[in-house]
Structures are given as structure tokens and as C-alpha cells.
């Protein structure tokens, strides 16, 4: 089985989280990691033990979906665990990494992506494989904390290229997200994306 397309992003988030825990030089994304560290990321039935899932979800199609998601995660973990451990040692983040610790950091990265990521595909565009899907999955610090609202739309967001991104001192990526209001907001009104 091939891992899902979000695994490449989860690996990047995992390595960045390991950097945060092993050095005093914080990454550009340090405040975002601090925010993520305050989340339990255990609200999805994917992360519950099977006894709890059966007790709470018996008779629901969500039970089988959660079991499949858990199996997918375990498959992804089996595919990437050795590479993640090797990267952590090669980058001198840790002399060796306990696999249970590394697994939990990776699990939290996957959970964050599942609950907070945006897919940047254009309307009507479909990802044809896991690699293309991975290229279209992004985490957008701060925007993912916004209240979501679909009907009627109050804001829109779009990706804009960052020109000369390679000349920047800090790796911020090649794109920026720009949010625009679709209505006039009064002071104190909630802004929902």
C-alpha cells in the first residue's frame, strides 16, 4: 500500500517538531508548534483504542472509517519510521530517537494535518496520485485557527506566489495565502473563513 499524500507534509512537520525539541534555535514556525503542542489531538476516533470505538460507535459507519484510518496511519508509520529516525540522527537532533517518542510526534503531525490542513487544488481540479495530493496539502498557521463558515461565504482565500522566495533568509515557502472579505465587517464582528 502506498502512503496517503499527506505523509510527506507530516514528515516535514515531524522533523520541524523534533528541531523544536532538540535545539534552542527555534524555527520560523516555533509559535505554531507551541500552539499545536497545546492540542490533545485525540478527539478523532482514529486515535481511540478499539474498545472505546466499539462502545461509542457501534452501529455507525464511522466505526469502520476510524478503523481504516488507524490502519492507514500504521501503514504510513511503517513506511516512514526508519527514514524519520535516520533524518533525526543525521541532522544531529538526537543521538538516537526512541521509536515510541518518534511515533507520537509523527502521529500528532498527521492529526494536525487531518484537522487543520487546506487543500489548495483549484475548483474542479482533482489530484491524480498521492504525490500530487501532497503538493496541494498545506498548513496555514493562524488561518487554520479561524472560525469556518460556508453559507453564505464571508471571506475567500487564495494562494499567491512569493517572488524571489529563494533569496529570503528564512524558508517561508514559495506561496502566501491572502484572505479577502466578501462583505463589510463592523468592528467586533467575527471574521469567518
Regions found by a protein language model. Name each.
Residues 1, 19, 27, 33-193:
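Long, positively charged leader/targeting segments at protein N-termini
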Residues 1-2, 6-13:
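Hydrophobic or amphipathic alpha-helical targeting/insertion segments
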